[in-house]
Amino acid sequence: MSKGEWNNRSKNTVPLQLPITYLKSVKRNTITHEFDSGSQAEILPLQESDDNLSEASKLLRQGIQQQQAGEFLTAMKSLQQSLGLFQAIGDLPKQAQVLCFLGLVTYSAGDYKAAISHSQQCLSLLNNTSDLALQMQALSHLGNSYRHLNDHSKAIEFLEKCLKITQQLQDKRSQLAALNNLGLVYKALGNFTQAIEYQQQSLEIVRELKDNWGEEQVLKNLGNAWYALDNYPKAIAYYEQCVVIARSLKNVRSASQVLKNLGNACYALYDYVKAIKYYEERLQLAREIQDNRSEEQSLGSLGVACEALGDYNKAITYYEERLLLARSMKDRRSEEEALARLKAACYALGDYAKAMQYPG
């Protein structure tokens, strides 16, 4: 799977979509499914004999393309028009398809209540039908939407139903997404043990699928869950695997985030030398991609770790670099923090004259 096939949505969920799906990478530790270009031909025939049906199909195809381009408002308009035409000709299966896709689009746009409404309408049309794939999609949208609305009991209810169907269909990719979503719900509830159980199942499947992008995300999720449980050795084990894959995929931003987590986990274990190693790697990556915020954070982390080792001179060097960068970014808060750390490091060295050079 190529990097271009991965989505950059920042939502912390994994929606399933119609009807052929594949994994894409997203920000903040998530995996998502998207249409591939070939799937549209399976949804709609290229030509229809009935004018209304032909126009409805055209609008549905157009809505799909607009959603893929991130044009959610125009996608909603096209899909609503398509739905009206399918309703006029009484085509219930196509209405269910459009409603399910409207659930996805409104979910993607952050309108979770609308996503729930569309998905519930879709399910009501699917009663007593054998279209398990579409039911699976609608259940996924419902579960993810309820999670964002912090209704975790309903989120679990719908996602467990979704997972059951993925298992019936033996759809490994959708099963992976459902497991990952359930893990995220339990993480939001603070039940990290249950979240880890789902994520561990996700890891087995993603490795079976030989999907490196998906594996990177699942490893990161597992590392985060173990970190939240203060089990830093296990967190480090998963993060280290994750960063190797992220580097091989040239996913520099993800590698940068995981290196930060690795440094923090090592610091929590009082392994300051190893923490410095990871912070330095992150600093190098931040400079390569000209990410000033990550660079500023890395410099601060390095200073703190050097202080922990008693190397105040090196800590001062990092803090001074951080101070210059914070000023260039016009980041008053980071500037004040850097000044405070500089004064403290100078006092620790007994260099009171130098400490007085730093205002604040």
Where are these regions (language model features)?
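Flexible inter-repeat linkers and adjacent short helices
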Residues: M1-D111, L123-S124, A353, Q357-G360
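Short coil/turn linkers that connect adjacent helices within long alpha-helical scaffolds
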Residues: E48-D50, A69, A88-D91, L125-D131, ...
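Conserved alpha-helical positions within TPR/SEL1-like repeat arrays
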Residues: S57-Q68, K94-S108, A133-N150, L159, ...
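Long, mixed-charge, low-complexity intrinsically disordered regions
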Residues: S78, S248-N251, A268, V273, ...
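TPR/TPR-like (Sel1-like) alpha-helical repeat modules
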Residues: I316-K330, E336-G360
